[in-house]
C-alpha cells in the first residue's frame, strides 16, 4: 500500500484541497463533465479529511461549473495564441496547466509560500510549467516571469472574494506596470452573496468571503486600466451539469447572483 501524505493547511489555503477533491470526484463519474487525472492521483495520495467537501454538494457543483467555463475560455485563448505566457494567480492545487499541456510556451503557477510548499510535494514544475512562491500583491514575483512580448493570459480563480478592494487594485496595478497588453480572466462574486450566503465547507475551513463586485463593468471602475470585454456567468457551466439551468438560467436574478468570470483586457 502506498503511504499517504499528510498536509496541514487552514483558512483560505484549505479551500484548495476541497476544490481539488471536487474535481477528482467529478472525474471518477462514468458520465463526467470534466476529466482531471492529476486531481484523482493527488487525492489518492493525500491523508486528509475530505468530509467537509463531501458534504457540500453546492460547493462541488460550483467548482465543476467554474472549471467548465474557465477551461473553455482558456482553451479558446490558447487556440488563438499558442505561444502565450500564462499566469495562474492563487493557483492552489489547480491542474489546468496539465489539461492544457502543449498549448502554451510558459505557465506560471503563483501562490503564497505556505501553499506552494504543499503543491511542490505533489507537482514537480520546472518548465515549461513553473512555480512562484510569492503573494500576487508582492511585485517582486514579476522578476521570476520570463517575458519577451508574448501574448499574456492571467487567470485569477477563487481569490477576489477573500480580498479587499485595495488588494484587488494592487494585484491589477502590478500587472499593469509589467505588461503593455494582457487578458485577465478573473472570477468575481456578487456583493449580495458575499454578505448573505455561506458555503458549508468554506465556513468550516475558517475562510470568509469579504469582497464582491456586481459585474465586469463595475470592476472596470475599480481597475480602469483594464477594460471589461464580457462576463461569463457560471450559470453557463451549470447548464452543462443540470439541464434545468437552461430554463432558470434565463432569470436575471439567478445570473446576477451567480459568480462570473470577467474578461478584462489591457
Task: Give residue spans per PLM region.
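Short amphipathic alpha-helix with an adjacent loop that forms part of the alpha/beta core around
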Residues: 140-149
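Short, glycine-/aromatic-enriched active-site segment of Class I SAM-dependent methyltransferases
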Residues: 191-207
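A conserved beta-strand element that flanks and buttresses the S-adenosyl-L-methionine
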Residues: 154-155
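Short alpha-helix
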Residues: 206-236
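Conserved beta-strand signature within the Rossmann-like core of class I S-adenosyl-L-methionine
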Residues: 178-191
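Core SAM-dependent methyltransferase catalytic element
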Residues: 239-266
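Rossmann-like AdoMet
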Residues: 1-87, 91-134, 148
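A short, conserved alpha-helix within the catalytic core of class I
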Residues: 162-175
